[in-house]
Amino acid sequence: EHEAALEKQQKEYEKTIQALRQQLQEQDETAASSQMEYVAIQTQAAGKTIVLDEALTRVLIDKQLQEEGWEADSEELTYQKGARPEKGHNRAIAEWPTNYQGQKGRADYVLFAGLTPIAVVEAKKENTNVAGKIRQAERYSKGFQIAAPLVPAFDLAGRTIAWPDDNDAHYNVPFVYSCNGRPYVPQLAEQCGTWFRDVRSPSNTKRALEKFHTPDGLLDLLKRSKEKAEQALKAEPFGYLKLRDYQEKAIHAVEGTLEKDSRRALLAMATGTGKTRTIIGLMYRFLKAERFKRILFLVDRNALGQQAIDAFNEAPLEQNQTLSKIYNVAEMGDMAAEAETRVQVATVQAMVKRVFMNDTPPPVDAYDCIIIDEAHRGYTLDQEMTEGELATRDASQYLSSYRRVLDYFDAVKIGLTA
């Protein structure tokens, strides 16, 4: 009886969504965007009580792609209806045909940055292991046929050929996603979230994201070579940093950890051993080698943030210049995240407000490296951590927010502790 009632409810929701879609088709172009928003809201509400099929899931995914700067409409922007990539447009085109080893298929979405196919998206219904379905997106990447006027992604990356896989085939599209429109919940990790993999290297593993990357974020990731940056770091001398031996070893240890494809590192240095000086040296090396685009230096108190700013303004580096003289360092309160900003100093509280209490939160690719000062304090949660603009009801609520800030950004995390 319960199953019959649930099936009846699901049919009613599907009927409602279908009616909304019909209304959308009948609207003129001026009303289309607001109507699509309404459809997405209704679909999201329906998804709380029923299992959404793949078609309804795409309504949610369309909206999520739009929020990150992609032109997306899986009803209208389809290959069959004549949608094609266009210079100056970041477009998600649905149902793009592929052919991998004679097996024809259709990618749910291919994301184009201008004329360059940069990512494949596999959309799945809700009760599906979305993490496991990323292999299907990988097959579509290998089966994508590049022909004029398309510009291959490997061209933009400075290569002459696509990226090889383990079986004598090549990935023609460098990034792949698998998702079902549901937000990421760690307890249900493989059943939700936006799963992502950079297929350019066999050692790159899939990972869950809060959102899709922006077009600019994917283009930066495409053009930023981890291998070249690591070579530059190995060739970069330490002399001008005037560090002690153990400080240089600490920097080498962090760089070596990241070279092994780990995305997390913890640096423990006792009080009085020059932790701040060491981390400034590490940050400068990262930026000079173009290992990272933008670093978020995260603190839990205004006082620690100001100490960091003072150190960035005073500690001499190459040619006796300071970090803030060489690179654009955004101080606390300056949260504009302009393109030229290379280092952002912020409190956890300010980032919680910016990410979770803002109508226009930053994209997940706003920072690709986060350095957490006094990282252990995020877990001890002493009374000092309530300082700042954000008032929290209890420690568990704050801890949840602290971790959510770290997990929100698609970034390498480096914790500092005594």
Locate predicted features:
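ATP-dependent helicase/translocase motor core
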Residues: E1-R294, V299, A303-Q319, E340-V343, ...
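Acidic carboxylate-rich catalytic motifs and surrounding loops in phosphoryl-/glycosyl-chemistry enzymes
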Residues: E75-T78, Y327, T417-A418
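A generic local structural motif
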Residues: A162-P164, M283-Y284, V329-G333, V355-D359, ...
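Structural recognition of the conserved hydrophobic beta-strand(s) that form the central parallel beta-sheet
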Residues: S178, Q344-T347, I371, A411-T417
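Conserved helicase motor
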Residues: N302, S324-D334, V348-K353
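Acidic/polar loop patches that form or flank catalytic/metal-binding clefts of enzymes
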Residues: Q319-K325, R377-G378, I414-L416
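Activation segment
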Residues: V352-V355, Y379
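SF2 helicase catalytic motif II
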Residues: P362-I414
